[in-house]
């Protein structure tokens, strides 16, 4: 992540914390100004449209924390199961956003089944990565990707809205 983008996301995080905890109307106005400045910097640094950056930054409420993405590493007979994303045609491990009220294990079972029709038994977490340190393009949000090694119990792929 380049320094300018790093600083902009830190400014946004500080502004969001201020908006969450401040009661003073003048401070709230200043924190909103900081969020707008952060959005301008992010837009200029990434070539993302300003209104889209603002949509992401201003929809967040509360203290900012990373989003969590879970991915199933399903290996059988030296082959790894990948799914093709309908959105952009790229190949990836089955997975997605972690849902609230589900454990990491429950989330990975759900995602593997939804995206690949795979019934799995999660064995162990093999990696936790900060997405922006390992992927392009950079995302406005901070995302932690949790990779879970899974045993494949059964597979029966069904057409779905996310993968093919």
Spans of model-derived segments:
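Short amphipathic alpha-helical heptad-repeat segments
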Residues: 1-12
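Long alpha-helical scaffolds
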Residues: 8, 15, 31, 35-38, ...
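Acidic, metal-coordinating catalytic segment for phosphate/diphosphate chemistry
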Residues: 26-28, 32-71
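Unchanged
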Residues: 98-122, 130-164
């Amino acid at each position: 992540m380049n320094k300018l983008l790093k600083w902009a996301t830190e400014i946004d995080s500080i502004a969001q914390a201020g908006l969450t905890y401040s009661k003073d109307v003048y401070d709230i106005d200043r924190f909103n100004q900081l969020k707008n400045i952060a959005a301008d910097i992010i837009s200029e640094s990434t070539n993302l449209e300003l209104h889209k950056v603002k949509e992401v930054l201003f929809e967040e409420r509360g203290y900012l924390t990373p989003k969590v993405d879970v991915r199933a590493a399903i290996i059988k007979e030296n082959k790894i199961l990948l799914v093709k994303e309908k959105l952009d045609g790229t190949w990836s491990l089955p997975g997605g956003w972690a849902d609230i009220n589900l454990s990491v294990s429950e989330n990975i079972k759900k995602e593997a089944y939804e995206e690949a029709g795979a019934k799995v038994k999660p064995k162990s977490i093999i990696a936790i990565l900060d997405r922006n340190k390992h992927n392009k393009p950079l995302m406005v949000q901070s995302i932690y990707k949790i990779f879970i090694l899974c045993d494949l119990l059964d597979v029966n792929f069904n057409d779905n809205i996310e993968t093919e």
